[in-house]
Amino acid sequence: MNSAPSFDDRKRVVERGYDKVAHDYARLEGETAWPRMRWLKKMLNQLEPGSSILDLGCGSGDPADIEVAKEHKVTGVDISQTQINLARQNVPTGNFIHGDAGSVEFPVASFDAVISFYTLEHIPREEHETILRRIHQWLRPDGFLLISLEAGEVDSIISEWLGVPMHFSCFDPETVKWLVNRVGFEIVETEIESQVEQGDAIPYLWLLARKQ
């Protein structure tokens, strides 16, 4: 019997996949930008100009980090070097780091907000609580967390996503909200919204929280 893929195996699938589909995914980001930008602006309206914002799983930086960089300092992390290269082109004022969201390090109280769109769903869900705790540490008092991820329980590598294998790993929305509360956040607002990707309507959980 074949053993289940290791954490590292699953992460390599994500890294290779996003390296290969970077330009196709950038187009998809443009087609599905509206919920991301609506939630992002909702959070940005509560921050002072010049705030420090971390985008965990930043992709190409378009459109979110382009918007953030208009008035704020942006740091982005992505497991795909190709995506990081695109982000550096799209947002020249940003600081973009090639790294794994599960192991990257920042000093305590480094950021006023952390955003992570469509990223946790690619990280083994066994790591989600640990990553949320680390985000809580990186945030300054009253800092914001804004995340989105697929609103369904899944843990598998699918054979075809934009033409490549891809790993998805999510808890159900109630468990995600429980974890966010458990690590020390107060949830400000949540919503499940569907968006069409490759002809399919996929529900996503959007969650805005604040560090207690």
Regions found by a protein language model. Give the residues of each.
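A conserved beta-strand element that flanks and buttresses the S-adenosyl-L-methionine
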Residues: 115
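Conserved beta-strand signature within the Rossmann-like core of class I S-adenosyl-L-methionine
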Residues: 142-149
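Short, glycine-/aromatic-enriched active-site segment of Class I SAM-dependent methyltransferases
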Residues: 150-167
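Core SAM-dependent methyltransferase catalytic element
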Residues: 196-212
